[in-house]
């Protein structure tokens, strides 16, 4: 039986498919560098670097991508991770780093981590995301970070005291997210928020105010404020992922008894709270707020009565609301005032 015809047809189809693939690849290779680098920016840093083996055309493209994202995995690969970050920063064009994310264990390598931060700050980074954990020594972030003129978005997530330098001024910062940061005194908190003159969006997630009596949040451009106080809740129910970091600031937990948070929001449009009302919240000059969402977690009966007064105090400072969203837990807490 003659099978040459089907085989020839299959070979032709395979050849044609290969030709089409080569044509598509050439078309991609002929795209301008900025477009290819933009495409690479959607990949993880590791995958973007792996494209360097495709051809000579791709060999150095990754060195100019504007976004770098480093996420450390298991501790047994730490040395490999540290060397990888060092090598990438050494080979990358520093003038093109606009977005830098770092998620890693600190351990005893604060000097390395600070040098990486200084490197991207020096070259005018615009978006900086830091997720730091597992501290085995005290960390003081480099002073240059707190006067970075190019920075527009900053995320700082770490279960550690925030040590501020004498000068704090973010002239371009519009979005600030603080996660599980420990503030050690009134002065440092005031210094940080006053150093953000054009801040528009502020998120404070499970932060601890150690030895802080009053927190004053005042920014003339602030439009959206989100506060979460779930830390004590997650500790109670064993949902905290940062328990290993507690040793770094063991005394900080014991000094946390709540504080008064005063919010001056002349441009504030939206406020959202989620968690346990362990602090007092007061609004001043905040007639611009139109959207408020409150989700309060129920505690014991004595705390619920106190929380009910705090909800009432919070809402009494808001006079121009168009939308108010409250959770079932918030309603239950407020009902304590009616019962008593």
Predicted features by range, described:
Residues 2-11, 18, 22-218:
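Leucine-rich repeat
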Residues 14-17, 243, 326:
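Intrinsically disordered, low-complexity repeat segments enriched in small/polar residues
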Residues 49, 109, 137, 163, ...:
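Eukaryotic short linear interaction motifs
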Residues 159-160, 230-231, 329-330:
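Generic short beta-strand segments
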Residues 169, 174-285, 305, 338:
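Plant-skewed but cross-kingdom recognition/interaction modules and surfaces
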Residues 272-340:
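Extended repeat-based solenoid scaffolds, especially LRR ectodomains
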